[in-house]
Design a protein with these regions (language model features):
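Short beta-strand segments
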Residues: 10-14, 103-107, 131
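Electropositive, glycine-dotted interaction segments
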Residues: 106-217
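Conserved P-loop NTP-binding catalytic core
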Residues: 32-35, 41, 45, 54-106, ...
């Protein structure tokens, strides 16, 4: 879900919980009694906000994976992110994810003018979410310690990014961090992406005779 991002003021949610339809069962991941889609598509009229939905999650991924040291050369465009804001509220981003070990996590953060206002990570056990860590400004609470006393936290950097590097053996942090590393968001309507695909297909046709024969059937 995301809120106050570009043209979206109110909270919007992309729900990937599977319906009762039985088509394309290969695209469904099952956890206990719940089923989730592995892939989803967004479609709609022109200028309806489809690209901004993708950019919200792409922005979230970049904030997590780009360290503070490399932000100067990063593709994060802070000014463009806020260009459609109509108030002084922070951007709020949150995902509920299914990790590779079938654990379910809820992770999110709020950011205002490139400063992290809050950040949180919860793990789902049975039907309830339990806190792994919660952050307010530069203060982080994580049982059994108050991490702000142990780690120098920059106001622009996410704690998930920091602690994933400090404690590489922490399963919860690595599960969430790796999920973002392996997640992909594609804008099929982007002309640059279309040119990339067309070039790849053209090269495939030129270099692979079997592929060429299949296309000509």
């Amino acid at each position: 879900s995301f809120k106050n991002f570009k043209s979206f003021k109110d909270e919007n949610c992309l729900d990937m919980e599977a319906t009762s339809l039985k088509e394309h069962e290969y695209n469904v991941a099952k956890v206990d009694n719940d089923e989730y889609l592995k892939v989803s598509a967004i479609y709609g009229a022109n200028a309806s906000g489809k690209t901004n939905v993708l950019q919200a999650f792409d922005y979230m991924k970049k904030r997590i994976l780009v360290s503070d040291d490399s932000k100067k050369n990063s593709p994060i465009d802070e000014e463009n992110v806020y260009s459609f804001m109509i108030n002084n509220d922070p951007i709020a981003l949150e995902v509920e994810i299914l990790a590779k070990n079938n654990k379910i996590y809820k992770y999110g953060f709020e950011v205002l003018k490139d400063k992290i206002i809050s950040e949180w990570l919860f793990e789902k056990r049975v039907n309830k979410f339990y806190s792994i860590f919660e952050r307010e400004s530069n203060n982080v609470s994580m049982k059994p310690n108050k991490i702000s006393e142990l780690v120098n936290i920059d106001e622009r950097t996410l704690f998930l990014n920091i602690y994933s590097k400090i404690d590489r053996n922490n399963e919860d942090f690595s599960n969430v961090y790796d999920w973002f590393v392996n997640s992909t968001y594609l804008d099929l309507g982007n002309p640059n992406f279309e040119r990339f695909i067309n070039n790849r297909v053209s090269l495939k046709i030129l270099s692979d005779e079997n592929y060429k024969k299949e296309l000509l059937k």
